[in-house]
Amino acid sequence: HSDGIFTDSYSRYRKQMAVQKYLAAVLGRRYRQRVRNK
């Protein structure tokens, strides 16, 4: 089923994007705190 493959890869892609967004938020917050401390 090409459908199933598409849906699976798409959901995996969505998960990756969510993880990247989360990491960007965490790293951004940490970076801002470090800058404020200097």
From Swiss-Prot:
Cross-referenced Pfam families: Hormone_2
Keyword Secreted: yes
Disulphide linkage map: none
Coiled-coil region list: none
GO CC annotation terms, alphabetical: extracellular region; neuron projection; perikaryon
Keyword Secreted appears in the UniProt entry: yes
GO molecular function: neuropeptide hormone activity; peptide hormone receptor binding; pituitary adenylate cyclase activating polypeptide activity
Lysine amide modifications at: K38
Gene3D superfamilies linked: 6.10.250.590
Protein's UniProt name: Pituitary adenylate cyclase-activating polypeptide
